[in-house]
Amino acid sequence: MIFHILFNYNQYNKVMDEKIQKVLEEKIRESTSKINEITTLVNSFGQMKNPNVFGHGIIIGRLYNSFYYQSRRILKRNPTEQEFSEFIQLLKKHENELLEISFS
């Protein structure tokens, strides 16, 4: 019950800066359009048990780096826990789109 209340509270009281959210949405589009670059990077490590996990890790890492960097650049501070929670929700919103990408 309390999780439901907190989750709904977080949905209606967005604190993530709109500029940061815009940058992240663009970075998601950019990452999904640069599959060839990421695939080349993944393949440069030779035989991997699961290249998709590594490729998705690269994308998530790029997005996390952008989130953190833009928070520091635009807001002049580290992101708050609530902003980080909104970042996670943004990733979940694009989860299917990101998981459809294959790097093998």
Predicted features and spans:
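Short terminal alpha-helical segments
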Residues: Y12-S44
